């Protein structure tokens, strides 16, 4: 039986393969990282097979979100705010469509809230 870390890596590789197959590299991807305390998201444009360029980024450590609370911010409320902030920053750079890269995380809870917040101004 595989442990949770192995299952996470398998899910992550499966999601990345689907993104590469479906988008064909023509859309930037919205990548998500979650820790126990914070959540981070960035819009990445893949230039080649080994090169990538970050277009916009947002996290719970940003000044707009950080001033509201001093405690843990990896919850649904803050994840939605991070998604909205990232969508605003991507729109200011001219990005309207992205592919959602949830990594190895299940599409549930915080990850879903971030996607819903970003979906208000971006097309998936």
UniProtKB/Swiss-Prot annotation:
GO terms for biological process: translation. Keywords: Ribonucleoprotein, Ribosomal protein, RNA-binding, rRNA-binding. SUPFAM superfamilies: Translational machinery components. One of its GO terms (cellular component) is cytosolic large ribosomal subunit. Belongs to the universal ribosomal protein uL18 family. NCBIfam families: L18_bact. HAMAP family: Ribosomal_uL18_B (MF_01337_B). Part of the 50S ribosomal subunit; part of the 5S rRNA/L5/L18/L25 subcomplex. Contacts the 5S and 23S rRNAs. This is Large ribosomal subunit protein uL18. The lineage of its organism: Bacteria, Pseudomonadati, Pseudomonadota, Alphaproteobacteria, Rickettsiales.
């Amino acid at each position: 039986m595989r442990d949770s870390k192995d299952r996470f890596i398998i899910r992550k590789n499966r999601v990345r393969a689907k993104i590469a197959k479906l988008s064909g590299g023509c859309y930037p991807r919205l990548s998500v990282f979650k820790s126990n305390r914070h959540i981070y998201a960035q819009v990445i444009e893949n230039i080649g097979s080994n090169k990538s360029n970050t277009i916009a980024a947002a996290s719970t450590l940003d000044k707009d979100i950080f001033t509201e609370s001093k405690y843990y911010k990896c919850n649904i409320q803050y994840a939605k705010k991070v998604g909205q902030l990232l969508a605003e920053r991507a729109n200011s750079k001219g990005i309207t469509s992205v592919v959602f890269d949830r990594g190895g995380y299940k599409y549930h809870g915080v990850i879903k809230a971030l996607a819903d917040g970003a979906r208000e101004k971006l097309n998936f």
